[in-house]
């Protein structure tokens, strides 16, 4: 066990070291990146990893369908290109010329201008 005089010498030495360094309890060097920025970067990284895993899973599913030779049916309501050139015709159902408007369109414009 330490004697009282040895303990006093150690305490005086520690006090001298603390006073001479003048750190005041603050870190000696400032950090280049704050903890908040590190946590933000970690969150972005985890989201990116999660997206990559999801994409890998989806691509693996597509690869499995292709390797098994499964024919995928077209979904109803999805866009499909016309198979024949004749089907790709513009519809002339709108007889309005440019600048012409319906009564409802004019009413909306008048109300918008008055405000």
UniProtKB/Swiss-Prot annotation:
Propeptide feature ranges: 26-31
Start and end residues of each stretch annotated as Important for receptor binding: 51-69
UniProt keyword list: Cleavage on pair of basic residues, Hormone, Secreted, Signal
Tissue: Hypothalamus and parathyroid gland.
Range of residues in the leader sequence: 1-25
InterPro entries associated with the record: PTH, PTH/PTH-rel
Any one of the GO BP annotations: positive regulation of ossification
Location relative to the cell: Secreted
Region (Disordered): 76-101
Gene Ontology molecular-function annotations: hormone activity; parathyroid hormone receptor binding; peptide hormone receptor binding; receptor ligand activity; type 1 parathyroid hormone receptor binding
GO CC annotations, alphabetized: extracellular space
Summary of subunit composition and partner proteins: Interacts with PTH1R (via N-terminal extracellular domain).
Function: Parathyroid hormone elevates calcium level by dissolving the salts in bone and preventing their renal excretion. Acts by binding to its receptor, PTH1R, activating G protein-coupled receptor signaling. Stimulates [1-14C]-2-deoxy-D-glucose (2DG) transport and glycogen synthesis in osteoblastic cells.
Homology family: Belongs to the parathyroid hormone family.
UniProt-recorded name of the protein: Parathyroid hormone
Organism: Rattus norvegicus
Phylogenetic lineage: Eukaryota, Metazoa, Chordata, Craniata, Vertebrata
């Amino acid at each position: 066990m330490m004697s009282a005089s040895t303990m006093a010498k150690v305490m005086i030495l520690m006090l001298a070291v603390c006073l001479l360094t003048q750190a005041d309890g603050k870190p000696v060097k400032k950090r280049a990146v704050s903890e908040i920025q590190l946590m933000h970067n970690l969150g972005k990284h985890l989201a990116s990893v999660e997206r990559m895993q999801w994409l890998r899973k989806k691509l693996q599913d597509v690869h499995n369908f292709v390797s098994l030779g499964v024919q995928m049916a077209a979904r109803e309501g999805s866009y499909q290109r016309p198979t024949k050139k004749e089907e790709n015709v513009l519809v002339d159902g709108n007889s309005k010329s440019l600048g012409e408007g319906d009564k409802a369109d004019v009413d909306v414009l008048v109300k918008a201008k008055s405000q």
